[in-house]
Amino acid sequence: MGTHRDVRFVSSGVKLPCADAAPAPAPAPTLLSAALPFARIGRAIDGVVRHVARSLPRLPVARAETGAGAAAAPIALPRRQKDGGGGGGGEERVLISEVAVRGKDGEPLERPELEAAAAAALRACRPNAALTVREVQEDVHRVVESGLFRSCMPVAVDTRDGIRLVFEVEPNQDFHGLVCEGANMLPSKFLEDAFHDRHGKIINIRHLDQVIKSVNGWYQERGLTGLVSYAEILSGGILRLQVSEAEVNNINIRFLDRRTGEPTVGKTQPETILRHLTTKKGQAYNRAQVKRDVETILTMGIMEDVTIIPQPVGDSNKVDLVMNLVERPSGGFSAGGGISSGITNGPLSGLIGSFAYSHRNVFGRNKKLNLSLERGQIDSIFRLNYTDPWIDGDNKRTSRTIMVQNSRTPGTLIHGGDHPDHGPITIGRVTAGIEYSRPFRPKWSGTLGLIFQHAGARDDKGNPIIRDFYNSQLTASGNAYDDTLLAKLESVYTDSGDRSSTMFVFNIEQGLPILPEWLSFNRVTARLRQGYEIGPARLLLSASGGHVEGNFSPHEAFAIGGTNSVRGYEEGAVGSGRSYAVGSGEVSCRMFGPLEGVVFGDYGSDLSSGPKVPGDPAGARGKPGSGYGYGVGIRVDSPLGPLRLEYAFNDKQARRFHFGVGYRN
């Protein structure tokens, strides 16, 4: 509960109580039917206007007091000539010898500054001026519209020196507190700041009107449906504001047919949709929040179209939200292709064909099942993934992925290319694991996993081998296969999805030697990418690095060089080590349509750690350990991501084309 002097904020709004003040709240009007505050002031002014119209032009008899209204009975005046000018439009004018401002009892005001403020508001009414009823009416309006007075009564008094026009004003009360009801979303500090210097001063209707506009603007800027629906001054100088906020009454889900648009029975469980919404029953209706909820449902990948329509509930300030959903087909088969990360010589050896089956809404609960097979001349990958994007009963949006994979990939990244007397080496891996991921800050997410891997090298006939042509060992244990149980911890930061944003990935893997023959090592990697907009161009800087400590398989060393590393070199041709560092910079510019031109430069090094890899595969093959490349390229946007074609030179003046799909790692 926030406090400020004698300001006290309560749960349903704000309250600045006055000592011994007991306001009698009036029923609040509805959100849409409420008028601006102090409508009674307008009615009072109209009454004054009618009184002035009756009094000034006629022949009165005497002056009398009539209580709080302080109405004046005019005295006799001589007949006046009609105004022949354009200003009065034919109205009779009365010559005024003196103009004064007094309190409603006819006595001078206690505060001279109030008398000066009322006098300053007068425009037409000046001493020795011939006035019409219209001009007096306009000055009455000006005095009241100054915001300091609750009433203003013009009184004409016949004196020895002529007609004396007295404006009898009633100032507003001094401000001693504020009661604000219904402001559940409005921060208490907002009104504290608006009234912090007004305590003990005359309530100014102009200032109050500005506060009301700022409150309404606060709701509008944040996409909230809310406004000040009523305002009044209570006894004791207490201001009462009634705020009406649209409240969510119910959220109803309606599935529509993809073809006809008619209501149909959906496959998705309603609770699966509702748990993804940040808008809840009983909350204030927030248009921006509802828009984000629509985007969230679309990112689930199971809906083709989502709309949320608010509908008013009777005469209340509540709304029902109707969510119209069009479901996508739940699953199906697909086929495609790609390029191996371990491209070898030959026109077709780097190409991969793929076949997959996916079901994106298992059990109608947004669970994902993917079964894929990739096959190339050398590569072969069978993968089974089952993902629960949001575990039931968890309120932190934790996801779970279960994975099983059997793969055979080229060993050329670490163990070089073919030799006349020795065929290509492939690395076979059988992997199974489970991972849990969740966001833990607005732009941060984390992953914790446990993965088991059974991996080893094979010759061109598929037979297990433990040494290559250079007599370098291919496994860390000396057996045909290395077994590893990895505990994985990963943290990812990204501030947006575009390429001109910041991304940081930090990963730790620890081998757990539960059995004596299982490998024990620690691997740490990090990647950083930062983009900048420079006029029509875009600068992208990236860096990555890592280190392995312990007993690990040679084929798990860091490979440097290639399309996603140092361009201008073949895959893994710069080196392979226990440690590595790679930096890259590129400037891209849109040429026309989806075509983009790129200029780039890369540098990578194994930080002199190549000989520390078991068997020293980089030293046996004469890899330099460091190198750089530069070149130009073009990119074309496609449904699969950017298609990259690049032509690069390395520091050995060798030239090489690189082709890739998607953004560089």
Curated annotation (Swiss-Prot):
All copies of domain POTRA, residue ranges: 246-328
One cellular component (GO) term of this entry: chloroplast outer membrane
Keywords: Chloroplast, Membrane, Plastid, Plastid outer membrane
Family, per entry: Belongs to the OEP80 (TC 1.B.33.2) family.
Coiled-coil ranges per UniProt: none
Cited InterPro entries: Bac_surfAg_D15, BamA/TamA_POTRA, D15-like, POTRA
An example Gene Ontology biological process: embryo development ending in seed dormancy
Statement: the UniProt record of this protein carries the keyword Chloroplast: yes
UniProt main location, coarse: plastid
Highest taxon in the source lineage: Eukaryota
Protein name stated in the entry: Outer envelope protein 80, chloroplastic
Entry-linked Pfam families: Omp85, POTRA
Location within or outside the cell: Plastid, Chloroplast outer membrane
Additional notes on this entry: Probably not processed upon targeting to chloroplasts.
Gene name of this polypeptide: OEP80
Transmembrane segments: none
Organism of this sequence: Oryza sativa subsp. indica (Rice)
